[in-house]
């Protein structure tokens, strides 16, 4: 087979090479290098500027972000290179229906800011497993959830984004796939490991701007190439590969390509699944995922968090126009490559017999744009990759450090937590690189669908547990635990079946079991949600209700309750008493006191001499990890609240609410127009 791949002689035989003789010229590379230097400068500036020697400073950016970097970071964290590759690819293959995920997310991010975030703020939580620990007590739910979140991050986020970004870089720079990945990660890891969330948010803001400028520019070129929207609607249905078999339906554009709502039984995205099955994973992602919630918790106050969510919601309208439509244009301009239907030719073009729609966006960039702009779009793809990777790295590190490591070592010092958080980022990188070949082998032509199907099998049970915890005071730990377990087991069964019984190619008969073949993954999401909901409700109703302290401040209806002092300290607390100046123990009176550990008497009695003759290398490493000597005198409370009040300025609140109504109205109009 290898010899067959390399034997054709004609230099421009497209089936052999999706990007013949196309790459980056010196002008493009200059733009790309400038971008890298600029991002690195912003990352290092925020690293120096912000306080990173505390858990709050590193993991939550000190809790003083204003609305616009929060909004930009929400958008950039969501829109990774997987979006550019995946949305454009699905647009090329099946039309605009995939944009339903983006429009659905618009509503969900607003629900986060107006409904879920006030509960998280009232409960003074920093991670999502911590919320469940406070709401239900015990450790089994937070531990299961922390492990599940890390699993989802590695297998549906980090690996996919690295793979998608590396495809683009590999084709444009003609580098080895893994060399491209390692180069990207080297730059990404520097400011993620060093700067924490503040560096991530500031660089996200810069990268959002670059993404929008580049993607809007390419959209303009794309529509100009096909004669605008009317030309797109007319020519898309004529975009057929010349090597397609005439007596086969494979490779034909869908008749409903310009509709979001499609047939409930035979379509790729049935409309009941879009309305209901899609909404549950969307709620999980936008309202309970650590990556997203962590950005809003870093805001100065609730109003700034709402402003950031509104900004992200407005930006969520754009992917249909800057990713999906250009993907459809790419099919029109390059039908033989993007719309290939012959498995053997597809294998030669993009190493994927299932189809090559995922090359739609890179093909458009490298073939359509002039020198300089091509480099800008490369920067856009790198920005998308790096922004989502840094966000996931920081949030996964937060979960591992605060929810798993703190449980294993409840007396861990602040210094230890800072080091563990950074080392875990490096471990994540390694595991994700090892998983890339699996993504490469299993994604079946549409990368975005790979992500969404796995999400539909794992996320609904978690979303239902959060929803029940937030809105039904009777929900208890037993109900939440058994609901979570039943839903996850059912989802894992379907996930394993999907990997065993791979979807056949268009030209092959479908002999998969009925459970896999006939139940769409969005319908399965609805089934999972229903099973989890019934289990949580039934078990909670027939077992003891939760105590008052597990409900106060932790549901929508109790978020304004007066403070109830909890007897138990969170597992993060290393000591329950404080040492006074003379070394005598004194009982702690509040959770804020019990973190003021033995600073005074350590310097007095033990005189732990950390300073003698530290080499410059050691000092540099300690600075990189945010560990500085002056931090000894002001060790902060680990469980310090981020946003401490739900109060808002009445004028600002009114302005935000008016914007909310306008934004939702725009989204409903777009849904209706393209439905």
Curated annotation (Swiss-Prot):
Extracellular side: 1-27, 89-102, 157-180, 230-272, 330-375, 440-446, 501-521
GO function terms (MF aspect): D-glucose:sodium symporter activity; myo-inositol transmembrane transporter activity; polyol transmembrane transporter activity
Alphabetized UniProt keyword annotations: Apoptosis, Cell membrane, Ion transport, Membrane, Sodium, Sodium transport, Sugar transport, Symport, Transmembrane, Transmembrane helix, Transport
Cytoplasmic side: 49-65, 124-135, 202-208, 294-308, 397-418, 468-479, 543-654
Localization: Membrane; Apical cell membrane
GO biological processes: apoptotic process; myo-inositol transport
Membrane topology annotation: Multi-pass membrane protein
Main location per the UniProt record: membrane
Tissue: Highest expression in heart, skeletal muscle, kidney, liver and placenta. Weaker expression in brain, colon, spleen, lung and peripheral blood leukocytes.
An annotated GO cellular component: plasma membrane
Regulation: MI transport activity inhibited by D-chiro-inositol (DCI), phlorizin (Pz) and sodium (Na(+)). Insulin increases D-chiro-inositol uptake.
Pfam families, sorted: SSF (PF00474)
Domain of life: Eukaryota
Keyword Ligase listed: no
InterPro entries associated with the record: Na/Glc_symporter_sf, Na/solute_symporter
Bilayer-spanning residue ranges: 28-48, 66-88, 103-123, 136-156, 181-201, 209-229, 273-293, 309-329, 376-396, 419-439, 447-467, 480-500, 522-542, 655-675
Catalytic activity: myo-inositol(out) + 2 Na(+)(out) = myo-inositol(in) + 2 Na(+)(in); 1D-chiro-inositol(out) + 2 Na(+)(out) = 1D-chiro-inositol(in) + 2 Na(+)(in); D-glucose(out) + 2 Na(+)(out) = D-glucose(in) + 2 Na(+)(in); D-xylose(out) + 2 Na(+)(out) = D-xylose(in) + 2 Na(+)(in)
Known function: Involved in the sodium-dependent cotransport of myo-inositol (MI) with a Na(+):MI stoichiometry of 2:1. Exclusively responsible for apical MI transport and absorption in intestine. Can also transport D-chiro-inositol (DCI) but not L-fucose. Exhibits stereospecific cotransport of both D-glucose and D-xylose. May induce apoptosis through the TNF-alpha, PDCD1 pathway. May play a role in the regulation of MI concentration in serum, involving reabsorption in at least the proximal tubule of the kidney.
Matching PANTHER family: SODIUM_MYO-INOSITOL COTRANSPORTER 2 (PTHR11819:SF171), SOLUTE CARRIER FAMILY 5 (PTHR11819)
Similarity-based family: Belongs to the sodium:solute symporter (SSF) (TC 2.A.21) family.
Other comment: Acts as an autoimmune modifier in systemic lupus erythematosus (SLE) as it is significantly associated with low complement component 4 (C4), anti-Smith antibody, serositis, and alopecia.
Name of the protein: Sodium/myo-inositol cotransporter 2
Source species: Homo sapiens (Human)
Gene designation: SLC5A11
